[in-house]
C-alpha cells in the first residue's frame, strides 16, 4: 500500500499504482515518486533494491520499463522528463522498514500535525515498535526515546553525517562497487505519447 511519504499528491499515487508493479517485477522497490511541475514537467522516481545498492544500470533498466508502461497507460497529459535515481546517502525514509534498517543513524522527522507542541524532531533512530517509529531526542539536557506513529509522518530523511557516509562506502566496497558515478541520476526524455531516450522535448 502506497503511503503519503512515497506518493503525496493524487497524481503521484495514481502513478505509483501504475509503476510499482513494473518496478517490483524487475526486483526493485519504489522509494518515492513525485510529479514536479514548472518550466519542464519532471517525473522523479527513487528506487532501490530490497537490500540496498542500486546502480546506474539498474536505474536505466527501471527507466526503460517505466517509460514503456507509461506509453500504454498515458497518465501524464503534458510532455515530461523522467528521472530515475537511487535514494542517495541522506535518503528519504518512506517505509516503516527504513526506520528499522537505519537504526542508530541520525534523522529528521516531521509530522503533519503538532505533537506535544512541535512538528519537527531530530535525533538518532531507535528502530520501530509495531506501527511506531522510535527516535532518541534531546530534551532538557537528557536523551529520551519517543514514539511517533508512522502515519503521523509527513516527511523523514537521514541526516548526512560522517558515520553514515562511512557506512555507505563500507557497504559499497563490500559489494565490490567503487564507482561513485553510481549515485548519478538517469534521465530520459518522455512524453504523454511515451517517447523515451530522446533529447528532444515531446508533446
Curated annotation (Swiss-Prot):
One of its GO terms (biological process) is translation. The gene is rimP. Keywords: Cytoplasm, Ribosome biogenesis. This is Ribosome maturation factor RimP. Required for maturation of 30S ribosomal subunits. GO terms for cellular component: cytosol. The lineage of its organism: Bacteria, Pseudomonadati, Pseudomonadota, Alphaproteobacteria, Rhodobacterales. It comes from the Bacteria. It is found in: Cytoplasm. Residues 183-203 are annotated as: Disordered. It comes from Ruegeria sp. (strain TM1040). Belongs to the RimP family. InterPro entries: Ribosome_maturation_RimP, RimP_C, RimP_C_sf, RimP_N, RimP_N_sf. Pfam families: DUF150_C, RimP_N.
Amino acid at each position: 500500500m502506497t503511503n503519503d511519504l512515497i506518493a503525496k499528491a493524487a497524481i503521484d499515487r495514481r502513478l505509483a499504482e501504475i509503476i510499482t508493479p513494473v518496478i517490483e517485477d524487475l526486483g526493485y522497490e519504489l522509494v518515492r515518486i513525485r510529479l514536479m511541475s514548472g518550466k519542464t514537467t519532471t517525473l522523479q522516481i527513487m528506487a532501490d533494491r530490497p537490500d540496498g545498492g542500486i546502480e546506474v544500470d539498474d536505474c536505466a533498466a527501471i527507466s526503460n520499463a517505466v517509460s514503456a508502461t507509461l506509453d500504454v497507460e498515458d497518465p501524464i497529459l503534458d510532455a515530461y522528463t523522467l528521472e530515475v535515481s537511487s535514494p542517495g546517502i541522506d535518503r528519504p525514509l518512506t517505509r516503516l522498514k527504513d526506520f528499522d534498517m537505519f537504526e542508530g543513524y541520525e534523522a529528521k522527522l516531521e509530522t503533519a500535525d503538532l505533537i506535544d507542541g512541535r512538528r519537527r524532531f531530530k535525533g538518532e533512530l531507535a528502530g520501530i515498535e509495531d506501527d511506531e517509529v522510535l527516535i532518541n531526542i534531546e530534551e532538557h539536557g537528557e536523551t529520551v526515546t519517543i514514539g511517533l506513529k508512522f502515519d503521523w509522518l509527513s516527511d523523514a530523511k537521514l541526516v548526512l553525517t560522517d558515520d553514515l557516509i562511512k557506512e555507505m562506502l563500507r557497504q559499497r566496497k563490500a559489494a565490490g562497487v567503487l564507482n561513485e558515478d553510481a549515485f548519478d541520476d538517469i534521465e530520459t526524455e518522455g512524453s504523454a505519447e511515451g517517447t523515451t531516450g530522446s533529447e528532444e522535448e515531446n508533446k
